[in-house]
Amino acid sequence: MSLARGHGDTAASTAAPLSEEGEVTSGLQALAVEDTGGPSASAGKAEDEGEGGREETEREGSGGEEAQGEVPSAGGEEPAEEDSEDWCVPCSDEEVELPADGQPWMPPPSEIQRLYELLAAHGTLELQAEILPRRPPTPEAQSEEERSDEEPEAKEEEEEKPHMPTEFDFDDEPVTPKDSLIDRRRTPGSSARSQKREARLDKVLSDMKRHKKLEEQILRTGRDLFSLDSEDPSPASPPLRSSGSSLFPRQRKY
């Protein structure tokens, strides 16, 4: 049977093997009854014939399915080809700007004649255009040279500012400050305003030197500098030393 037959042929081809298989089985039964002397040989021949019939039916069935599958696939290729044929070309600017009637714009012949006559007479045509007002120019970006010129000016202004003393100012030879040991309590009748005090490094250094000097004086004489200034001992009398227990309890002599 050929594989190119239609649906009717495939149905007939499937029905024919079934009838043949029935005939084969009936023939096998008849052979089994008649051939009593060689049952093994007849049974082997019957099995071979049965297997051959089954292989033929399987081949025909698979061929029919392939034929049925080819029919819808051929029909499905047609819409795919139609889809691939769909294409579009965008319109040009002139086609988009066409008027409603579809004809391109063209000046009337009388206007064309008038313009040619003006060109022949005057040589040039006056441009008919609306002159729009001008806007102010855009300020130009500042160049790097101008910026570099402005930076020294800013530095000069900073240098011209008066220097304010701070606690970190240091002089090689600090000026000895005034005596700051005087009690600065406000006396009755004086102004309540107090002078603003600023911390300066030279003052800190001078205070350190003064305290060191006081310590050396106390260690050398055993008396405080204030007591020496307040008392006026006579030069003949020896200096009175205070007991070491009052000033230096740890420096007693035994």
Swiss-Prot record:
A molecular-function term among this protein's GO annotations: nuclear estrogen receptor binding
Region named Sufficient for interaction with ESR1: 161-254
Region (Disordered): 1-111, 127-254
Lineage: Eukaryota, Metazoa, Chordata, Craniata, Vertebrata
UniProt keyword DNA repair present: yes
Tissue note: Ubiquitously expressed.
Biased composition (Basic and acidic residues): 45-62, 195-223
GO biological process entries: DNA recombination; DNA repair; positive regulation of cell cycle G1/S phase transition; positive regulation of intracellular estrogen receptor signaling pathway; positive regulation of transcription by RNA polymerase II
Highest taxon, organism lineage: Eukaryota
Region of interest: Sufficient for interaction with NCOA1: 116-160
Species in which this protein is naturally found: Homo sapiens
GO terms for cellular component: histone methyltransferase complex; MLL3/4 complex; nucleoplasm; nucleus
Function (record text): Its association with the histone methyltransferase MLL2/MLL3 complex is suggesting a role in epigenetic transcriptional activation. However, in association with PAXIP1/PTIP is proposed to function at least in part independently of the MLL2/MLL3 complex. Proposed to be recruited by PAXIP1 to sites of DNA damage where the PAGR1:PAXIP1 complex is required for cell survival in response to DNA damage independently of the MLL2/MLL3 complex. However, its function in DNA damage has been questioned.
Record protein name field: PAXIP1-associated glutamate-rich protein 1
PANTHER family: PAXIP1-ASSOCIATED GLUTAMATE-RICH PROTEIN 1
Compartments, as annotated in UniProt: Nucleus
